[in-house]
């Protein structure tokens, strides 16, 4: 749909990864990415960061797997994203809410007191999250 992004006076815009360059011009108060940068190449992630810094994004929340090997063989690491030393991480830790999922799967099940909980499974990698005040620059 061509109208995926909000108009320039909107307070919220949803933007699919392949349309990020189509966001309306202007500063971004808060950008959020949950479990999708881990599906991109490092070059695509770098493009996101470049755009966020260009748009003077004030706060960026990022929650993605610490490490993931992409189907093409590239190993993507959260800590290798193009963070700057001048970025200020307000939260920087293993994400307490994104370590498991509901569904039918062969993935390991979450256990409480040694008892497997039906339909609750652990992801095959730790998810990390950062709430960051992005430094401006490249």
Regions found by a protein language model. Name each.
Residues 56-68:
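Conserved beta-strand signature within the Rossmann-like core of class I S-adenosyl-L-methionine
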Residues 1-24:
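S-adenosyl-L-methionine
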Residues 39-52:
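A short, conserved alpha-helix within the catalytic core of class I
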Residues 21-22, 39-40, 68-71:
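Flexible loop/turn segments at secondary-structure boundaries
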